[in-house]
Amino acid sequence: MKYYVVADPHGFYLYLRQALEEAGFFEDNEPHKLIVCGDVLDRGEESAEIVDFLLELASKDMLILVKGNHEDLFVQCLMDIAKGYVVDIASGCSYHYRNRTWHSILQLTKMKEKTAVDFSGSLVTKARNTRFYRELLPLCRDYYETDHYVFCHGWIPVINNGDKYSPIFEYDPDWRNADLTRWREARWYIGMQLACENGIKEPGKTIVCGHWHTSFGHNKYEGKGTYRGDADDLTPFYADGIIALDGCTVRSKRVNCIVIED
């Protein structure tokens, strides 16, 4: 099977489509699928368009959607709104505002911010009736695996023999059976760091991930460009056991796309 693989489109439908066009996705007459390694929304202004596009592919059995931390954040934001924190969120005092999850919810529900704050119960109801919540989120999986690759968002779950502030990570051979809490944590990991510094890899396979800007890996492990500077290299990062794809689309105006046959 041929897989076109992207990560972190973050609500930029046109950039995603452009990447797929350049890779030959739409002209490919052989069986193929799109793998999205998480974070569909929360940056761009084309939330509805990207959701409709992915669901169209899903209806043709052409989509594999891996859950990212921003998929978790969407659900958590609605829970926090329902608990009465809508004013804090809308006023910018919450990570839901800084992460742009609040803005994605407004886009999908087509509610004005003041109306959403004044009628937060209606906002939650409308958000839970969007195609993203009802149709796309249920398609998410923690990871996808082929003979030679594992596709995830941050990284695979690991064992932490330290604590939250001084972690000591090691490979967990039973990571596939990790519970929901550990998968949620794994979606926040920096895969490049775990692979290149901690040596945590899947034996015999390459892990393809997103979540963290690839300029981090290029700068820290290759000595190329900057990290969060004027000379960031945001192309895919390749190293032993890892391919990282998050191209920081909000800055680069591109979505990284690779093609894998396996």
Identify the residue ranges that each predicted region occupies.
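Short glycine-/acidic-enriched loop or helix-start segments at secondary-structure transitions
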Residues: 16, 46, 75-77, 161-162, ...
